[in-house]
């Protein structure tokens, strides 16, 4: 009878512990649903608004620096593999089978009748048997610490009844923001990876020299002009002097002096050396002065002849 009483007390204490666990679970569920989840949802809404407003600046700085920030990305939906789905379905089926077996054993244990005990145990007190058969347990005055049980009384659980250990699933959090896991950190570390430089195609420059409405640039004019050496420059100056002398003789009427000419710049004639150009211009000016003097003297002689 001592063993029977101990089993009865143990079952009642177990049921009381289960009731207490159920009450604690309901309390935790009520706390999570009424207090924690609304705060988390409100925080998520505020974070979404902040993220939407900062997207423009993130893209602007990435484009200006030609980099990409990898720590502040939006979550990307993870594609599920068919093999993972098969493993999950097999594990759920095994859990359901184990749960049904445990329920069946509990029902058999709760509906234990008098026929399962020996005659010596049945001939005991009827009140004890009635208390044992009742479904609603009574609170015992004895606590769990006062009850002492031998290790042999506890039957070990068979291996086929134990829940198989699951392998840790390595779910890669691809595309998820790393900042969500470091909310309380003070030092932010964001990985920055440079992008590949874009190959800019060389744009064809419009040939402005070919257009009749656009004047050529002075650089192209200088490049097109042939470089004059000393012989060509002296030859050009001599030809210019002869042409000027002939033009004076043909244009000016008789008895009038030709106009005085200005000093020519050596740069307009394309002379390379400035010193040589100055010397040539001085010699040319002297020749012109002598011509003017001779012409004046000739005019004076004609006037004297007329008188």
UniProtKB/Swiss-Prot annotation:
Residues 117-137, 250-307 are annotated as: Disordered. Residues 298-307 have a biased composition (Basic and acidic residues). GO terms for cellular component: condensed chromosome, centromeric region; cytosol; DASH complex; kinetochore; mitotic spindle kinetochore microtubule; mitotic spindle polar microtubule; mitotic spindle pole body; nucleus. The keyword Disulfide bond does not apply. It is found in: Nucleus; Cytoplasm, Cytoskeleton, Spindle; Chromosome, Centromere, Kinetochore; Cytoplasm, Cytoskeleton. GO terms for biological process: cell division; cortical microtubule organization; mitotic sister chromatid biorientation; protein transport along microtubule to mitotic spindle pole body; spindle attachment to meiosis I kinetochore. Signal peptide: none annotated. The modification Phosphothreonine is found at residue 136. The keyword Cell membrane does not apply. Keywords: Cell cycle, Cell division, Centromere, Chromosome, Chromosome partition, Cytoplasm, Cytoskeleton, Kinetochore, Meiosis, Microtubule, Mitosis, Nucleus, Phosphoprotein. InterPro entries: DASH_Ask1. Disruption phenotype: Sensitive to thiabendazole and osmotic stress. Double knockout of mal3 and ask1 leads to cell shape defects, including 6% T-shaped cells. PANTHER family: DASH COMPLEX SUBUNIT ASK1. Component of the DASH complex that connects microtubules with kinetochores and couples microtubule depolymerisation to chromosome movement; it is involved in retrieving kinetochores to the spindle poles before their re-orientation on the spindle in early mitosis and allows microtubule depolymerization to pull chromosomes apart and resist detachment during anaphase. Component of the DASH complex consisting of ask1, dad1, dad2, dad3, dad4, dam1, duo1, dad5, spc19 and spc34, with a stoichiometry of one copy of each subunit per complex. Multiple DASH complexes oligomerize to form a ring that encircles spindle microtubules and organizes the rod-like NDC80 complexes of the outer kinetochore. DASH complex oligomerization strengthens microtubule attachments. On cytoplasmic microtubules, DASH complexes appear to form patches instead of rings. Belongs to the DASH complex ASK1 family. This is DASH complex subunit ask1. It comes from Schizosaccharomyces pombe (strain 972 / ATCC 24843).
């Amino acid at each position: 009878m001592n063993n029977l009483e101990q089993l009865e007390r143990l079952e009642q204490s177990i049921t009381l512990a289960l009731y207490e666990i159920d009450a604690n679970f309901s309390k935790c569920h009520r706390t999570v649903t009424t207090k924690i989840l609304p705060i988390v949802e409100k925080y998520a809404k505020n974070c979404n608004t902040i993220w939407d407003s900062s997207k423009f600046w993130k893209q602007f700085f990435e484009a200006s620096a030609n980099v990409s920030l990898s720590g502040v990305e939006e979550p990307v939906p993870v594609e599920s593999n068919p093999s993972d789905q098969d493993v999950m379905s097999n594990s759920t089926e095994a859990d359901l089978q184990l749960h049904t077996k445990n329920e069946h054993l509990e029902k058999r244990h709760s509906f234990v009748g008098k026929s399962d005990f020996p005659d010596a145990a049945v001939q005991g007190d009827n009140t004890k048997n009635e208390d044992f058969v009742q479904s609603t347990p009574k609170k015992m005055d004895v606590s769990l610490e006062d009850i002492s049980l031998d290790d042999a009384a506890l039957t070990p659980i068979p291996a086929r009844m134990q829940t198989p250990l699951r392998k840790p699933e390595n779910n890669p959090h691809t595309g998820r923001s790393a900042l969500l896991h470091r909310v309380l950190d003070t030092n932010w570390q964001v990985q920055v990876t440079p992008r590949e430089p874009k190959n800019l195609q060389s744009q064809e420059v419009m040939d402005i020299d070919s257009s009749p409405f656009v004047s050529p640039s002075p650089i192209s004019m200088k490049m097109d002009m042939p470089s004059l050496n000393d012989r060509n420059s002296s030859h050009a100056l001599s030809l210019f002097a002869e042409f000027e002398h002939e033009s004076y003789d043909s244009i000016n009427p008789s008895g009038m002096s030709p106009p005085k000419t200005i000093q020519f710049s050596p740069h307009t004639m394309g002379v390379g050396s400035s010193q040589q150009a100055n010397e040539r211009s001085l010699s040319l000016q002297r020749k012109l002065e002598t011509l003017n003097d001779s012409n004046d003297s000739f005019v004076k002689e004609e006037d004297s002849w007329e008188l």
